[in-house]
Amino acid sequence: MATARTPRFLLLFCRSCRSLRGPQSRAYAALVPGVSQVDNGSDFLGKKPHRKHPGILHLPHVQLPQALADAAQLMLFERPMRSVEKQVQALTNYLWSRHLPVEPEELQRRAAYLEKKFLEKQDSAPTEEKLREAVLHALRKTTYHWQELSYSEELSLIYMAARLDGGFAAVFRAFHEIQARIPEFRPQTLMDFGSGTGSVAWAAHRTWGQSLREYVCVDSSAAMLGLAEKLLKGGSESGKPCIPGVFFRQFLPVSPKVQFDVVVSAYALSELPSRADRIEVIQNLWRKTSHFLVLVENGTKAGHRLLMDARNLVLGEKEKSPLDLRPSFVFAPCPHELPCPQLNASKSLACSFSQAYHPIPFNWNKKPKEEIFSMVILARGSPKEANRWPRITQPVLKRPRHVHCHLCCPDGHMQHAVVTARRHGRDLYRCARVSSWGDLLPVIAPSEFPPSSPDEEPPEN
């Protein structure tokens, strides 16, 4: 049989590709000098496939409990409103783009800076009144105008249609982190600050079931509390609660001695009017925490920075509580108690995660969605109890024979790790390949991980 000859130029091209590929792969692998083997302390390699390694924490599409979805649909259909879809989209966009209120000290600093700039540009000194008007005009144009949201019955329904499913998905993912890593933890009491639609109670009930005997839902809005209670009763005021032991309050419990196994604040800290209010609430929530304090906010820079402020505040409160002397540590997502490397980077990024979910099946809500959120879970006890595997902070890029993982490491540095089977072993390579954004990578990490330089990062393709 006659065989076709390969053109000479094609042979030369293939040889050149091979010569380029070898050194490049070695350069990729060299980016993770300290990651050399899987941490198989729990002997999972002999019991589970790689796709089920103990660092896997991501969830498939989350779906609301059917009773909750049915109740939400019933309540919205019972009260027809004009342009519901447009109102839902407008509120969703507004809440996502919301910033924290500007503190008075920052406002004064900006005003002084603008006044100085105006005076430098003027040939003759303006009158005090004109200067004041110019500064105020510039401040209005450049400063975020924060307004407190006041929830009426109608706005509460719009909020339910906009945020019930996404909020449930984010909180359920946070609870799953605790349940997956400490399956023996069986909480009996839970408090939810800024409870809104009550999605936290539903997510907790799905996670821990009948072990929870008391849920205290705290929200300043009477309309929102009424909506949450109605959802709990299947959409009617006279129905039987789907979850027993749920109590609704407008104020936090007064007694400092009352503690709850799990305390939650989901998308509520960002609604407080000042930094002083946030500090007071966070300290109060931590005093009421017996085991875990779960904080969730939007996956934006503002949401992430707010959570890092709360994290640093609680970690700085060590040995200051006269009622509970157990120290605090970060359970998730950080594998350390050091300053956040995402905030300290030259180009700061939000440490956020993604959870896919099936939305409530309204007419405009048919496609699966993703909730982008930031979270921090603080716990009482010794940091030695925590798992210190690196956290995957971005989507994993799977390429031929190598995997890109962006890791937050136990030494407080970010690392762009490119894992190969040849350099790091088949087990670690396969664990990395089946891991996703938000998972832990089960590796024996070095005590000191050098921070990655932007110049060292290989191309993604």
Swiss-Prot record:
Transit peptide: 1-19
One GO BP: ribosomal small subunit biogenesis
Name recorded for this polypeptide: Ribosome assembly protein METTL17, mitochondrial
Pfam hit, one: Rsm22
Protein source organism: Mus musculus (Mouse)
Taxonomic path: Eukaryota, Metazoa, Chordata, Craniata, Vertebrata
Subunit composition and interactions: Associates with the mitochondrial ribosome (mitoribosome).
Example of a GO cellular component annotation carried by this entry: mitochondrial matrix
Gene3D superfamilies for this protein: Vaccinia Virus protein VP39
Entry's free-text remark on domains: [4Fe-4S] cluster-binding is essential for its ability to promote assembly of the mitochondrial ribosome (mitoribosome).
